[in-house]
C-alpha cells in the first residue's frame, strides 16, 4: 500500500484520468473530491462490500428453484429431450 501525506488543496493523480483532491480536514475526518471518467465506478468501501454481498446472495439459486422455473417454461420438455 502506498501511503501519502497531503494538505488541504493538494492532489493525487492516479493513472492519466483520475485526480483526488483533499478538500477539508476536520478532526479525524477527511473530505476528498474525486475526478474520474463516468465509466469508473467509485464506491465507499462499506457500500462496495454490501453490493458484493447482495450479488453473492442473488447468485445462490437452489436446484429446486431452477426446476420450478423450468417447469413453468411452456417449451420445457424435461432433461434429455430436444425441442
Swiss-Prot record:
It is found in: Cytoplasm. One of its GO terms (cellular component) is cytosol. It comes from the Bacteria. One of its GO terms (molecular function) is mRNA 5'-UTR binding. The keyword RNA-binding applies. GO terms for biological process: bacterial-type flagellum organization; mRNA catabolic process; negative regulation of translational initiation; regulation of bacterial-type flagellum assembly; regulation of carbohydrate metabolic process. Its main location: cytoplasm. The gene is csrA. Pfam families: CsrA. Homodimer; the beta-strands of each monomer intercalate to form a hydrophobic core, while the alpha-helices form wings that extend away from the core. InterPro entries: CsrA, CsrA_sf. Belongs to the CsrA/RsmA family. This is Translational regulator CsrA. A translational regulator that binds mRNA to regulate translation initiation and/or mRNA stability. Usually binds in the 5'-UTR at or near the Shine-Dalgarno sequence preventing ribosome-binding, thus repressing translation. Its main target seems to be the major flagellin gene, while its function is anatagonized by FliW. Keywords: Bacterial flagellum biogenesis, Cytoplasm, Repressor, RNA-binding, Translation regulation.
